[in-house]
Structure formats: structure tokens, C-alpha cells
Design a protein with these regions (language model features):
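Conserved donor-binding/catalytic core segment of Leloir-type glycosyltransferases
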Residues: 69, 81-99, 105-112, 118
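Nucleotide-activated donor-binding/catalytic signature segment of Leloir-type glycosyltransferases, i.e.
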Residues: 127-157
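Nucleotide-sugar-dependent
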Residues: 99, 151-154, 161-181, 190-199
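Glycosyltransferase donor-sugar binding loop
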Residues: 92, 116-129
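Conserved acidic donor-binding segment of nucleotide-sugar-dependent glycosyltransferases
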Residues: 203-215, 223-229
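Short beta-strand->alpha-helix junction loop in the catalytic core
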Residues: 46-47, 64-75, 124
Length: 259
């Protein structure tokens, strides 16, 4: 379940007449769930705090995070030789409303040319949001609009994936599905500390969970440039964590919960 509609990121960006219809319907859905569901799955424990007005539903709730799909990925890759190539970062997802890449763009502007990022988003979303990002654009950032198989060449290039895309109450509660896409490709992840993604990455040692500011990101990237063996260390943690986080593993949990 997702409850974006309870937050300002939804309320401040949706027309009043749409909210007049949609929010009562979202509440209606929640009231109906308690009549229809045996188990009510939430992606994080933090989401429970926003559903206190539905105690019957919370009594049958359980945590079920998104899962990893199966990708054609080599389980072991060589340690990146960053003297011979750039450190490549990949971000896939939204850039407006919920997810904010301003701090990421600002930090990238100040990084050496040895670091490069691909930012993948919907073309329409880029057109709507680009005025916010253009002051920080440089040759270190390439904007792409790909999905599905079109993304695979960029995953093959990437040394790091980015989940460093904002902070706040919604980010502390919501678990981005892209984190599991990154994990499924065995690519180390940089995320914002004290968000749902950051806590998961920190717990499983899948990358770096850092404060949401330019200096923290720059320090993290400089550290990786100086110690590229860290990439292989994080990748090995992802290989170990993969099986427990596939969609098959999630399905097995559902089977056990419904017995």
C-alpha cells in the first residue's frame, strides 16, 4: 500500500477538484480493506504511524518490502579501475514533486571530471522540472529517458546507483522500488540517511547512507575515488542479500502468512 495522498507532496501538487474526489476514495479503499483482506501489507514499519485511525487494519498488517526481479547480471565483476575510467553514477526515477535531485546536481557540479552521472527520468517530467536543475548542469551529468531493456546498457556502465533524492516524512516512510532494481543489478547504492531506503541499505551493507547535504555526498564520492575496492565490498554484500530479497522470496513470505 502507499499513502502519498496523506502528505504535502500530493496535496500541494494536485488540483483541488481532483483532491475532492481522490482523497475520499483513498479513505474508502482503506475502510473496505478491513472487510476484504486477511493480511494488509505495508512496505515499512514507519507507515503504521499514518494509519492509526484504522486500528482493525493495523491489527492484521505485516511488512512486505518490494522485491528484486531476475536480471542477466554477472555475479562477480572486477573491481573498477578508476584510473582508467570515470566513476559512473546512475539515478532512475522521478525528479519532481516527491524526489528532489537539487543537492545531487549541486554536488556533482563541484566534483572532478573523473565522476559522471546518468539521470534517467520521464521526458515530460524533465521538461517540467529542468528550470530547477539547469543552473547546476554540466558535462558531468547526462539526462536520459529510458525504461525496461533500454536501461540495461546504463546499468552495465554504472559503478554506483543513486537513491540520494530528498528527505522528510514521506521519504522516511516510503520504500522506493528502484532500490531493489539497483540491488538486483548488484550495484552499490548511495542513499539519504534516516530514510527508509537509507536504513535498509545501511542494515544490509549495500552501499552508503549519508546525510542529505552536498558535503556528505562529495566526501562519500571522494572516498570511493580513493578506495575503489569499496565498490567490490558493497557488491559482494548485495550478492549475498539478493536471494532473500527477490520477488520469489516475497511470494514465499505471503504463502507462510496466509497458512
Amino acid at each position: 500500500s502507499d499513502i502519498q495522498w496523506k502528505f504535502s507532496v500530493y496535496r500541494d501538487n494536485v488540483s483541488w477538484y481532483k483532491k475532492c474526489f481522490s482523497i475520499p476514495m483513498y479513505r474508502y479503499d482503506l475502510r473496505q480493506y478491513k472487510k476484504l483482506l486477511n493480511v494488509f501489507y505495508l512496505p515499512t514499519d514507519e507507515m503504521r504511524a499514518y494509519l492509526k485511525e484504522y486500528p482493525e487494519l493495523l491489527n492484521r498488517s505485516a511488512i512486505l518490502m518490494p522485491g528484486c526481479a531476475e536480471y542477466d547480471v554477472d555475479a562477480v565483476q572486477a573491481i573498477s579501475d578508476l584510473t582508467a575510467k570515470k566513476l559512473e553514477i546512475l539515478y532512475v526515477g522521478g525528479i519532481d514533486r516527491i524526489y528532489d535531485l537539487t543537492v545531487f546536481f549541486q554536488a556533482m557540479q563541484q566534483m572532478p571530471d573523473q565522476v559522471h552521472a546518468y539521470v534517467c527520468c520521464r521526458e515530460k517530467e524533465w521538461e517540467n522540472a529542468k528550470s530547477k536543475y539547469l543552473p547546476y548542469m554540466s558535462e558531468k551529468i547526462s539526462i536520459i529517458h529510458e525504461s525496461g531493456q533500454g536501461l540495461e546498457p546504463y546499468y552495465k556502465k554504472a559503478d554506483i546507483c543513486c537513491a540520494f533524492a530528498g528527505e522528510g516524512d514521506y521519504m522516511r516512510m516510503a520504500m522506493p522500488i528502484k532500490v531493489f532494481e539497483y540491488l538486483g543489478h548488484y550495484i552499490p547504492i548511495i542513499a539519504t540517511k534516516d530514510t527508509a531506503a537509507g536504513k535498509f541499505i545501511e542494515k544490509e551493507n549495500l552501499g552508503w547512507s549519508i546525510e542529505y547535504n552536498q558535503e556528505a555526498l562529495k566526501q562519500c564520492l571522494h572516498n570511493i575515488l580513493q578506495n575503489p575496492a569499496l565498490l567490490q565490498e558493497k557488491r559482494e554484500s548485495e550478492i549475498s542479500a539478493y536471494e532473500a530479497n527477490t520477488w520469489k522470496a516475497r511470494a514465499k513470505q505471503v504463502i507462510l502468512d496466509l497458512k
